[in-house]
């Protein structure tokens, strides 16, 4: 991840920024997709990347595909919230798009790793970080095996990485243990509901009402 420093933004937008963090195999993407299907007011942030599209991928759906030159130009203009170079390819989250969506009153959700979450917090101090945990290491290993995507040696590496990643759960605002999917999804929805009812969020969404009522 980039270590480029950013100045924290204290502006409170009508929309909220959610970050969902989890080790591989914890069920993060499945939970996020289910949440998005139920809540039309949440926008999923689509990352920018310089890697070539894979078969079946569409620009603007899985990723915003771009050239190295255009990526670097956007990065140098400060258009990215966070960025990283992975296996020779660049990946980034658009700061401009996120701010536009939040200013319009839409909530934005990022699927991100803990390092990226730290960078986002440097820029958006009000961002809500939600950490998804497996019910046990055994369950995590079973899920990785059942996915059928990785060789045994890759699964071992993912489990080792998971231990390091989960040690950062204490830095999050909320922790959800994904043992029973429906329960975990309801807890994720509850976090979204509670965040929307925070004083700062309500004031940003109902500015004129708060002024009329003399609430500061």
Swiss-Prot record:
Guanylate kinase-like domain mapped to chain residues: 15-193
UniProt binding sites for ATP: 22-29
Pfam family, one: Guanylate_kin
Highest taxon listed in the record's lineage: Bacteria
Protein family membership: Belongs to the guanylate kinase family.
HAMAP family given in the database record: Guanylate_kinase (MF_00328)
Entry protein name: Guanylate kinase
Species this protein is from: Cupriavidus pinatubonensis (strain JMP 134 / LMG 1197) (Cupriavidus necator (strain JMP 134))
């Amino acid at each position: 991840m980039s270590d480029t420093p950013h100045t924290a933004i204290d502006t409170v937008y009508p929309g909220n920024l959610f970050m969902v963090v989890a080790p591989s195999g914890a069920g993060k993407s499945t939970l996020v997709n289910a949440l998005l299907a139920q809540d039309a007011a949440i926008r999923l942030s689509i990352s920018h990347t310089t890697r070539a599209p894979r078969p079946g991928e569409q620009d603007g759906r899985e990723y915003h595909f771009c050239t190295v030159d255009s990526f670097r130009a956007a990065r140098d203009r400060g258009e990215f919230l966070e960025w990283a170079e992975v296996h020779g390819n660049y990946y980034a989250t658009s700061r401009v798009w996120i701010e536009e969506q939040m200013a319009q009153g839409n909530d934005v959700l990022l699927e991100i790793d803990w390092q990226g979450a730290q960078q986002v917090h440097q820029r958006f101090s009000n961002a809500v970080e939600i950490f998804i945990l497996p019910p046990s290491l055994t369950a995590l290993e079973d899920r990785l095996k059942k996915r059928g995507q990785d060789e045994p040696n890759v699964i071992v590496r993912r489990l080792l990485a998971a231990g390091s990643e989960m040690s950062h759960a204490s830095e999050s605002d909320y922790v959800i243990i994904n043992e029973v999917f429906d329960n975990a999804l309801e807890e994720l929805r509850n976090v979204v509901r509670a965040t929307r009812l925070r004083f700062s969020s309500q004031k940003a969404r109902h500015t004129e009402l708060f002024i009329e009522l003399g609430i500061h």
